[in-house]
Amino acid sequence: IGCSNETTWGLTKSIAVAEREGVARYETIQNNFSLNNRRFEDELAQACRQEGVSLIPYSPLGGGVLSGKYNGGATPDGARFSNYLKLGGRQAVMARRFVNERSLASTERFGAIAGEAGMSLVTLATAWSKQHDFVASTIVGATHEDQLPEIFAAADVTLGKDVLDAINKVSQEIRYPMG
């Protein structure tokens, strides 16, 4: 049994109630977690470690932003957030959460790290997502079959300390790029 988009309080409270009532408890949590959205690490990661709950992160590519396709202000035809920006309203608000000056700046820096490490940004972002002790598996998505090789390449990648340190430096300098 799992939950999605839950808070630390909600997760720990539900576990306490399940234990009190003698019913099945949450074993997994599915939340957004990527190089551009590391809020899970603020509190939920520690709660998951203490309670034995595994994260199954979704959107490890930040809605496609971490593919680099929006770099330089590009709005690729047919891309989800390009379409959302055209629609306006609520969709545009969501798009701006993912595609903004800070997320694009961090994405470009992560891309440079990936290049120095000899891999694509997609592979770096996916490998980073799976390389946490609280992660059970990562939910990946692709709109085209040709996107899969870079994603699958991450299965065989373990990021070294120097790469992780470089990633963490970017995350410290550009805090919470998705707000």
Q: Across the structure, where does each feature detected by a protein language model lie?
A:
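Beta/alpha (TIM)-barrel catalytic core signal, keyed to glycine-rich beta->alpha loops juxtaposed to Asp/Glu
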Residues: 2-169, 174, 178
